[in-house]
């Protein structure tokens, strides 16, 4: 086979993995050959925040166990150096000062290390005030233990309070549609805030990713607007919002959506919003493939009125689409419209709809 006739296929969007960003916003890209040295380990806080909860719990549990074991070894070494392991602690020699009472084995040393870190008082095992080495080691263990507990507590609070958790309540429609608005085609998707607390300063941006034959990804910005709002952001997000992209000849999607089976691309949508209570920015992402963009469809209605006149949101219709009925763009008269009748793909005749009925 002539290698010059072979196409170079980029591994980023191969036949097996056709999506860069999942529907819930996670990236599927994998870094092969990336070296994780000291520069990576310096960001220990970021590594912890990115960990899954099960790994985070494992790391924290291991940190406590290692801390207890290290100081258990130190307490055992102190008892060995002071000659306390072989003594009768109930009747010690008069000229001998026991540093820690009843540490006669490594098990006892580990128990004392655990007791020092987790309790506010001692039982039968306790350090002697006449042994400076024991007092110094006790102070070091307490200081490092408090630092470890503060770090772990802060990491738990930071992970729970991340704005990322608020973003999970933002929901995009599973599909986007291409429908006509004011006679012009528009790419449309909807987004909903599933929590009663509002979001403010909502911004939406989108990037179109296309794979070229040279193995590179080409990125194009796609602009979306919200109804008739002229500003770049929506000031209040409590009910579902509908975003539109006008498919004009200059639109990057114009040539891609002309056919029923367009070439592969991925449209990644980013929504950023501010939490009203905390002022923190959260971001939600999703992506749409060509198979997830429905031509000549529109979304079902979401807003209804209740018995008392209040607005109600029918979330069961959030992902529901209905076929778009074609509307004539040109009419011969205000009361007369041409209508072509097709049976099995064959044009039969031309009729006109008037106020009095169907005429030939």
Swiss-Prot record:
Catalytic activity: K(+)(in) = K(+)(out)
Extracellular side: 78-105, 123-131
GO MF annotation: an example: inward rectifier potassium channel activity
Transmembrane annotation, as ranges: 51-77, 132-157
Intramembrane feature ranges: 106-122
Record keywords: Cataract, Cell membrane, Disease variant, Ion channel, Ion transport, Leber congenital amaurosis, Membrane, Phosphoprotein, Potassium, Potassium transport, Transmembrane, Transmembrane helix, Transport, Voltage-gated channel
The keyword Ion transport is assigned to this record: yes
Keyword Lyase: no
Protein name: Inward rectifier potassium channel 13
The encoding gene: KCNJ13
